[in-house]
Design a protein with these regions (language model features):
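N-terminal Rossmann-like NAD(P)+-binding domain of SDR-like oxidoreductases, especially those catalyzing
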Residues: 1-185, 336
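Short, flexible active-site loop motifs that bind/organize anionic cofactors or intermediates
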Residues: 7, 56, 84, 91, ...
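Residue-level signature of the cytosolic catalytic core of signaling kinases
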Residues: 58, 200-204, 272, 322
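A general alpha-helical scaffold signature found inside nucleotide-binding enzyme cores
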Residues: 104-107, 157, 202, 206, ...
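C-terminal substrate-binding subdomain of Rossmann-fold SDR/epimerase-dehydratase oxidoreductases
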Residues: 111, 213-344
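NAD(P)-dependent short-chain dehydrogenase/reductase
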Residues: 138, 164-252, 282-284
């Protein structure tokens, strides 16, 4: 059996592909249009796992191309599950370009589910987000009300509903993983080679990556968007998760889906909140470098606090966090940025 990953030339998808290649026997088919992904990630996976990765450059809206591929694939090596990472992910951009988010995220998920039903692909792992919850000042569990305050969160919430409704009427089951804030780089990287995995995102919007870019001199300054939120220091609080732990959460969710054949939703986080100011100061401390930080206006659509209640995934799957430490996350992100300086 094979696994099909969408968007796995990107940050989270590539790390998850590595985890599956390392810990399962399945071959992996990666579909990505390279609009935000990187061939370097495919090269790294192919280098360490030769003859186990197939890459197809395609957009998920190219349904005829994907349909033709699946017609052939299902005859020779049927797909056990789809892991769907392909999506737009910027809260700020979604406020400006909402229709792009509903098209790219929601509509493409709908078309992918239709292909699953047509080709008898019965299992689906979906990358969702804590942003579906909206504003909150407490630890969020999977039963917390959904109230997204931006089109990004709304597009993911609607995608979740498509999957869950389909699972009620078809031989089709899904695991939905609601990510909190992901950071860090692969803990298995060999930085003497170019065959590495990490966040290559251009013009990144992720706090830890931006702060680490400042620390290694790639940026002259950074901004904190809002310092008057109702939090302990006025800046937003987030639950930061190491990308390798998130990858392993996908593996645990997949294994549980195979075992129980039941659709489930899981938060993936550490149930620990760190403020923006705390993260920036920690990056300065670990890197031993100071850099300019400006206080800017709030970004529209940013919740004040998002912290995961992770009890469900810990109690009901094999998932066990390995890198549940802000220092560890930041150190791996700094190592990655220094590596990029050497190999770019």
């Amino acid at each position: 059996m094979a696994l099909l990953f969408t968007g796995a030339c990107g940050y989270i998808g590539s790390h998850t592909a590595r985890a599956f290649l390392e810990k399962t026997k399945e071959n992996i088919i990666i579909v990505d249009d390279l609009s935000t992904g990187f061939l370097e990630h495919i090269k790294a996976l192919e280098h360490y796992y030769p003859n186990r990765v197939v890459f197809i450059q395609a957009n998920l809206n190219e349904t005829q191309k994907l349909d033709a591929f699946l017609n052939k694939q299902q005859l020779k090596d049927p797909i056990e599950a789809i892991l769907h990472f392909g999506a737009k992910i910027s809260v700020e951009e979604s406020m400006r370009l909402p229709l792009e988010y509903y098209t790219n995220n929601t509509l493409n998920t709908l078309e992918l589910v239709k292909l699953c039903l047509k080709h008898a692909i019965k299992r689906f792992i979906f990358s969702s987000t804590a942003v579906v919850y909206g504003e909150s000042d407490f630890s969020l569990n999977e039963e917390s009300p959904l109230n997204p305050i931006n089109p990004y969160g709304a597009s993911k919430m609607m995608s979740e509903r498509i999957l869950l409704d389909t699972s009620k009427i078809a031989d089709f089951k899904c695991v939905i993983l609601r990510y909190f804030n992901v950071a860090g780089a692969c803990m298995h990287n060999d930085y003497t080679t170019p065959y590495t995995l990490g966040q290559r995102t251009l013009n990144a919007t992720h706090l830890i990556k931006i702060a680490c870019e400042c620390a290694v001199g790639k940026r002259k300054k950074m901004g904190i968007f809002g310092a008057n939120y109702p939090t302990r220091d006025g800046t937003c609080i987030r639950d930061y998760t190491h990308v390798d732990d998130l990858a392993n959460a996908h593996l645990a969710g997949y294994q549980t889906l195979l075992e129980k054949n039941k659709s489930e939703i899981y938060n993936v986080g550490y149930n620990q909140g760190h403020s923006v100011k705390e993260v920036v100061e920690k990056v300065k401390e670990i890197s031993n470098n100071d850099f300019l930080v400006e206080i800017l206006d709030k970004r529209q659509g940013d919740p004040a606090s998002l912290i995961a209640n992770n009890a469900k995934i810990l109690q009901n799957t094999p998932f066990k966090p390995l890198y549940n430490n802000l220092d560890t996350i930041i150190k791996s992100a700094l190592d990655w940025e220094e590596h990029l300086l050497r190999f770019q």
